[in-house]
């Protein structure tokens, strides 16, 4: 019997009130869904409105490395797994260990992000609000499917042309910019002979803009033995941006399970100084050679706890000039008790190293070794009302100590309604910040 086709159309009207410009914005759009078979799905949106998506946490970041924000828009979340080319790109880790930022060629938060500033005359300035406000999308389309042992996905999105309020000191006027166009293509071939898993994939992305295009290509491979004890994941990629030399990078990760609940991981990566995937992906930095490892022990059905997970991990890295630019060791432990309350303890030690990023192109400088400590407690999150908090301390890069205090309360009267209240206090002493040129204080 042939499967029945499924399709849906959801038209909508969105009204946005802009209190700064004292304007009302009206958007009429529609979402489309079509599944001609169980192995193929097409979704599209025209003039989408993402006002219902959960807002991001407020993060004050004055460093040279970008903060990574999770995707929360449903259109981009659905079927996102096919574009996750390696475990390093998966942001859904539940390990107690400190995982760090992802390595991914596809970060859909770039789509509809901050606009590219328009060119203005010397002495004129664009209003800050227009430079940081998300750009509207004209539309997006996504196709995902599977044919035998081949899985594939294609995504395209188109931004509207942004408008900027410009001031030259005498009068204000409007200047129009140009939006970007985004494209993603993914192909994954899988095989499992004799119970072992083998796969090879290709992932390509493109960002097209009048100021210059950015194209990234990646090849990934995966292997797991039939017993599931040994797992290997690897990816190599290159970037080609207008006006920038072609860059290369890659990594390989090994994971070995000695027994259930006991694993050891080892990762090796290399990123040259020209690799740049951040027009549509995310890399915390380039110009790096890094080795990292992690050891995780998970125990269940203990006399005093339901589960206990202990994790110790660390990394060392240097840049292309041979400078030791980072190294640390992290010890974490999470105990989930029989009443589902939990306690999390983390201790991190960062080694003396050179910081070659936060001078913003003005050379490298030496920073001290540092210690971070934190202790957190949380009640049972499955109950309608839950709460928790944590306290922590950290050493600053050139001396001084900072302290953090966090608390939250959550009330979920039913599956469709939730109220969350969070408090974060950070008291910093000796915060090292770039001022201008070679001045850091």
Regions found by a protein language model. Name each.
Residues 136, 231-441:
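Exposed, low-structure sequence patches enriched in small/polar residues
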């Amino acid at each position: 019997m042939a499967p029945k086709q499924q399709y849906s159309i959801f038209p909508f009207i969105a009204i946005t009130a802009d209190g700064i410009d004292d304007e009302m914005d009206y958007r009429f759009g529609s979402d489309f869904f079509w599944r001609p078979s169980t192995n193929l799905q097409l979704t599209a949106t025209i003039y989408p409105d993402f006002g219902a998506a959960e807002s991001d946490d407020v993060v004050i970041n004055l460093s040279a490395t970008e903060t990574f924000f999770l995707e929360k828009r449903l259109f981009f979340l659905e079927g996102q797994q096919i574009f996750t080319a390696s475990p390093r790109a998966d942001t859904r880790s539940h390990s107690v260990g400190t995982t760090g930022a992802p390595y991914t060629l596809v970060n859909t938060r770039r789509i509809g992000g901050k606009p590219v500033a328009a060119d203005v005359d010397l002495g004129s300035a664009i209003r800050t609000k227009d430079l940081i406000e998300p750009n509207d999308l004209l539309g997006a389309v996504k196709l995902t499917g599977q044919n035998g042992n081949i899985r594939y996905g294609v995504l395209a999105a188109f931004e509207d042309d942004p408008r900027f309020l410009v001031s030259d000191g005498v009068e204000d006027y409007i200047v129009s910019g140009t939006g970007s166009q985004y494209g993603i293509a993914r192909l994954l071939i899988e095989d499992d002979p004799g119970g072992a898993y083998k796969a090879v994939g290709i992932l390509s992305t493109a960002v097209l803009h009048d100021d210059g295009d950015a194209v990234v290509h990646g090849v990934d491979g995966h292997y797991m033995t039939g017993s599931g004890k040994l797992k290997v994941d690897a990816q190599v990629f290159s970037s080609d941006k207008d006006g920038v030399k072609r860059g290369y990078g890659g990594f390989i990760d090994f994971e070995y399970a000695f027994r259930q609940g006991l694993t050891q991981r080892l990762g090796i990566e290399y990123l040259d100084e020209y690799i740049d995937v951040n027009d549509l992906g995310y890399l915390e930095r380039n110009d790096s050679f890094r080795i990292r490892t992690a050891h995780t022990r998970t125990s269940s059905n203990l006399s005093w706890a339901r589960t206990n997970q202990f994790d110790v991990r660390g990394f060392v890295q240097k840049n292309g000039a041979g400078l030791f630019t980072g190294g640390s060791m992290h010890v974490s432990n999470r105990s989930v008790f029989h009443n589902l309350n939990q306690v999390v303890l983390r201790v991190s030690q960062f080694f003396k190293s050179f910081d070659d990023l936060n001078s913003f192109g003005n050379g490298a400088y030496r920073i001290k070794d540092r210690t971070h400590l934190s202790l957190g407690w949380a009640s049972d999150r499955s109950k309608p009302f839950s709460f928790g908090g944590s306290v922590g301390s950290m050493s600053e890069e050139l001396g001084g100590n900072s302290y953090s205090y966090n608390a939250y309360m959550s009330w979920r009267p039913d599956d469709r309604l939730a109220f969350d209240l969070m408090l974060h206090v950070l008291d910093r002493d000796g915060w090292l910040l770039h001022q201008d040129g070679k001045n850091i204080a």
